[in-house]
Amino acid sequence: MNEHNIVRVRDVMTPDVKTIDRMQTVAEAIEMMRHTGVSSLIVERRNENDEFGLIVVSDIATKVIGPDKSPDRVNVYDVMTKPVITVHEDMDIRYAVRLLGHFRISRALVIDHMRPPLGIVTLRDMVLRHGQSS
């Protein structure tokens, strides 16, 4: 793969990120996921010095539904992953795949130098795109 064939994270990310406040309930997160058709939500920062979080369907399954807790009584901050792993929009997807593989995770938040969330990138998206460019 030469310089002209490099696929960047921005080329495969899902740009429309859905966010949720950490104080909202897991029931609200489930409803938002159902309504928007996503399986993960970015948890907003409390302030500029805070980090983003991530809540995914598997978190809800293993930390709320499996242990038979009420989604109405559990807050997002109780089950989210924080800080979320981030990748820069200009990163070559080969390096992003390695990073996610190293941490055994399936998705990362995409940021730029200003750090607002630009999108979500998944291993699935990157692997399928890499197969097209080879």
Residue ranges and their predicted role:
Residues 46-50:
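Short, solvent-exposed loop/turn segments that connect beta-strands within catalytic domains
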Residues 1-15, 52-85, 92-105, 117-134:
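Tandem CBS (Bateman) regulatory domains
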Residues 20-38, 44-45, 87-105, 111-112, ...:
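The conserved cystathionine-beta-synthase
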